[in-house]
């Protein structure tokens, strides 16, 4: 997780620098598609991974994130571990990953429309992470969260993340029919993690 966080930090630094130096040379649509979108995603992923790093590293009563229980089912562990490195590389052999947040949707206006939708959904995903606060964790129960994004739905991060994956799969589907079945497999794994 620390690796992801630092990678996102360095990506953010590069995207921020590129955005500042290139702002005046692009039309607004091109600037959005080339720089702004990547900058926003870098910020979202950096904040998300920073929260989870903190949640994994620190556990204390005064943080209200003491582990109350650990998932004791084999299926809970299997489905959770299958989604994260290094095990996700094995999962990807059976369900090849075809989704890509940075994919092009065709012309500039389609890109803007779908990328705004992706930003909205990933903002919901980030809102869910922030709602967890110091309780961020994947395989431990640190208390039921019923505030923030969790006030509206039980698994807002899983729902928004899966919707982003399906949206970014749209350009791939015309050339790769198996991508549809593969994404059903990934969505099923996240459904199993949620129940």
Model-predicted regions and their roles:
Residues 1-139, 167-195:
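Membrane-anchoring alpha-helices and their flanking helix-loop junctions
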Residues 155:
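Short, conserved phosphate/pyrophosphate- and ester-handling motifs at nucleotide-, phospho-/glycolipid
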């Amino acid at each position: 997780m620390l690796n992801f966080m630092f990678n996102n930090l360095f990506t953010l630094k590069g995207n921020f620098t590129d955005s500042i130096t290139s702002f005046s040379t692009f039309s607004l649509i091109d600037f959005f598609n080339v720089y702004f979108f990547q900058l926003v995603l870098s910020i979202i992923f950096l904040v998300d991974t920073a929260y989870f790093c903190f949640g994994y590293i620190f556990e204390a009563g005064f943080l209200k994130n003491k582990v109350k229980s650990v998932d004791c089912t084999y299926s809970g562990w299997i489905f959770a571990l299958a989604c994260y490195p290094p095990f996700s590389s094995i999962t990807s052999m059976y369900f090849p990953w075809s989704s890509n947040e940075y994919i092009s949707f065709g012309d500039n206006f389609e890109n803007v429309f779908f990328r705004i939708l992706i930003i909205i959904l990933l903002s919901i995903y980030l809102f869910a992470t922030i709602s967890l606060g110091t309780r961020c964790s994947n395989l431990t129960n640190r208390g039921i969260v019923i505030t923030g994004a969790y006030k509206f739905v039980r698994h807002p991060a899983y729902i928004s993340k899966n919707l982003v994956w399906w949206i970014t799969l749209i350009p791939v589907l015309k050339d790769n029919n198996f991508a549809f079945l593969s994404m059903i497999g990934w969505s099923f794994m996240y459904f199993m993690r949620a129940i």
